[in-house]
Amino acid sequence: KSRLTVLAALGGPDEQRFEGSAENWSQEVPDFHVLAVECIAGPNAKYFSRTGGLPDDAFEHDGQMTKRVVRAATISALQPYPDALLWDIGSGCGSIAIEWMRAARGAEAIGIEPDEKRREMSKHNAISLGAPRFSIVDQDAPEGLEALPIPDAIFIGGGLTDEGVFDAAWTALRSGGRLVANAVTLESEAMLVRLHKDLGGTLDRIFASQAIAVGRYHGMKPFMTVTQWTVVKS
């Protein structure tokens, strides 16, 4: 059980120390105090690596999210590093942004997501997975990008073919920054092919399948194929 220690009125005549269990804390303490928490995991606590590719069920989501295998490849392509800022355009439940922040000390992320329910899910996920500094913009791109700080990396997981989204993102990205875009529709894939021809980078296809029960046997069920474009702005 996690333990709390409260040090109150330090250095004064009324200096006090309080100790107890976080679960059963009932003591009244002075307003001016220092709180120390000894975090002790419960028997059912889940331990997650900081390596990209958390289980899908680690996130609250509505089914529309970047699945684990593709997410791991996306985080690898983005190459998080300390104190770097990511824009996650079409952030959904926040899975990419949150894994970016978990992967490198001091890394920050801003999500751009117009759907209110998904914004709320992403806020919950950020707190529960240890990325409380994740911030989110409740606007569509490109309008929601205008006042944001310059990013070191950008991920476009939604809205790629919307008018002005890519141009605004590419203009904002700092020189030397990385942009990764995932496509599952033919229209967005065609756009990535054109961008790859014009700007270079790497264009990959990600195929993934997962075993499911088929009666008393099992078979491999494929996920939607993802085309991924990665480019560094020169």
Regions found by a protein language model. Name each.
Residues 168-227:
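C-terminal substrate-binding/active-site "lid" region of AdoMet-derived donor-dependent transferases
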Residues 106-110:
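Short beta-strand element of Class I
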Residues 34-40, 215-234:
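Core SAM-dependent methyltransferase catalytic element
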Residues 83-92:
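Conserved class I S-adenosyl-L-methionine
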Residues 113-118, 158-161, 184:
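Short beta->alpha hinge that forms the Motif I/post-I loop of the SAM-binding pocket
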Residues 1-63:
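A contiguous loop/helix-start segment that scaffolds small-molecule binding in enzyme catalytic cores
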Residues 93-105:
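Conserved SAM-binding loop of SAM-dependent methyltransferases across substrates and taxa
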Residues 112-153:
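S-adenosyl-L-methionine
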